Amino acid sequence: SKDWVGKKVIMDFGGTVFVGVATMVGLHRSGGTHGNIKVTGYSSTFLLESDHTCASWCNKSLSDIVKELTDKAGVQALVNPETKSKLEYECQYEETNFRFIQRLARQYQEWLYYDGQNLVFGKPQAGSTTKLTYGEELSVLDVCSQTLARPIKGSSYHSVNDQTYNGQSPDTAAGQNTLGQAAFDSSLALFTAPAIQRAEPRITNKGELDAYFQRKQQSDSAASNFITGESDCRILKVGSIIDVHTAIHTGIGIHVKNSIGTYIITEITHVAGMGDSYQNYFTALPSSIPTLPCPDVP
């Protein structure tokens, strides 16, 4: 088993495949003469966990930069960001390659996740939808709303043309379902004074600044409505679109199934046991949201 360290690992849950890298192997013994081999690893994005490094790019697009890094590391990636324009200048400073990609996703409010086989940068095309019904595939279901939306405004100075641009959030929900819209409106009713912030990316005109504050507010409030659940459906993964139904008891032996909406899975934990035992725990956001919550990076 010593030769397993650093090798590719393919895990098949009978419907979902996860590709990763074994980073640690150990022998575990307890209470007898027998023992177990314990393998620890990460997704293939571990190959982007270089030591802290520095680099810079001029007049390159986000796609160009991310593809360059993933290609060098040998990481399969689906790169299609909404930000298409070339960037005047972008710098990686004392960061791992993965942390730098996370920061780019945060700066430009782009989608970023690992679907089990590919690093996805940019909102993916909608795939097939899986129907999940509470009481059938779903054993636990929680539907939640929270007050996340805040008004924001700020400015950005462009030194080349000596211009200061001012902008603010539109304070309108985009892509939220009924529950998310209600939570968004309630939050803005609570927080009426705009926070003053600076734009993280380089801004060259007022249109870019307005778009930045719009997408930042969308990202900050993306989880205004979310669900968590437990299921035995083996085909689920991060990025899966699910149509969630719940059955309402209307009489003796009578149940009416209603859809509470379509969601995209953003977190999932797979638990596979002995034999055919399997269960997963997931969190999902409305599938129509334009951006994900920001990665927690500086």
Per-range role (PLM):
Residues 1-298:
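Amphipathic alpha-helical and helix-coil boundary elements used as assembly
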